[in-house]
Amino acid sequence: ELNRRIYEDCQELEILCNVVDQPQLCDFFVPAVVKRGNLQIAISTEGQCPAYSGHLRQKLEELFTETHGRFVDELAKARSRILETVPDGDRRKALLGQLASDESFEYFTAHGPEQWRHHADNQIQGPLL
């Protein structure tokens, strides 16, 4: 009953409220988060079963490594170069799709950031594959 009163008071005062164990009394939910550098993945069950969000977060923590975070940093640099040097929107989209692919990440993992940058620059300057 106290939680409901607090929630109702918050609603009247236009203050966001989160009653963790009562999803119907939540204006927002706090997701479980996996963060690897600038890569951030948020998982939520909208308050229905936070334990499952936590379980999924643990699985994703094993799947996504710090290498993924470093890859995002390199993608950001490549994206800036593409935006500065490639005037055609369709070509920019295609290049970004190529560079953000699984194959590109595998190349990054196998050869390292410096080689990947060279590989990315060749794609940016050359014809689409």
Features from the language model and the residues they span:
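A generic structural signal for short beta-strands and their flanking turns/coil linkers
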Residues: 13, 37-39
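Solvent-exposed alpha-helices and their adjacent loops that cap or buttress functional pockets
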Residues: 32-36
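ADP-ribose/adenylate-binding Rossmann-like module
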Residues: 1-30
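Short beta-strand and adjoining strand-loop segment in the mid-core
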Residues: 1, 39-47, 62
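An accessory alpha-helical subdomain
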Residues: 47-129
